[in-house]
Amino acid sequence: MKKIILGLFLMLGVVSFAAPSRINTAKIEQDGNMVIMDDSDVFAFGKLVDQSSVLAVTYYVGNKDVKILSEQIKNEQLVDGIDYVGSGESEAGYVHKLYAPKEGVYFYVVIAKRQKIQNYIITAILQTPEEYSSKSDLKAVIDLAIEEGEKYLK
């Protein structure tokens, strides 16, 4: 499990120091989440959803096009050993489904369409052995990721 968590966090990048002002970092840490990235325009944290699933939430700060960011994040995750399965969307966000056959885990990359706070885009990666295929399952993944991200905005 530790190897899976480490792999997910490494996919997200390097750690720096200067969180965006509208993110409640104290509450994130108080709730037992792990800060992954802390920069002036990107902040990310990770948490265990259950014994076999990890959620990493990232806030991108700035005036970015959500659809372009969605494709950009998806393409960044497509490395050797990761297969693109498909994508979908709901009113709340976009989701890209990827699979790592060697590890037997799925990655669901979620990007919120709407911003609770202007110029704060919520994205998330859910890593799980569970395959979610139905529209209602994918909508639940999108909702989980966005709700978790919005919970820590001031």
Predicted regions: what they are:
Residues 18-26:
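Cleaved targeting-peptide boundary
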Residues 29-31, 48-52, 90-93, 112-121:
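Short, solvent-exposed coil/turn segments at beta-strand boundaries
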Residues 26-34, 124-154:
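Surface-exposed amphipathic alpha-helical segments
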Residues 78-117:
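Signature of long, low-cysteine stretches enriched in small and polar/charged residues
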Residues 26-68:
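Secretory pathway targeting signatures of secreted, lumenal, and periplasmic proteins
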Residues 99-101, 112-119, 125-137:
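Short, exposed beta-strand-loop hairpins at the edges of beta-sheets
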Residues 4-14:
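Sec-dependent N-terminal signal peptides
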Residues 29-39, 76-89:
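Short secondary-structure junctions
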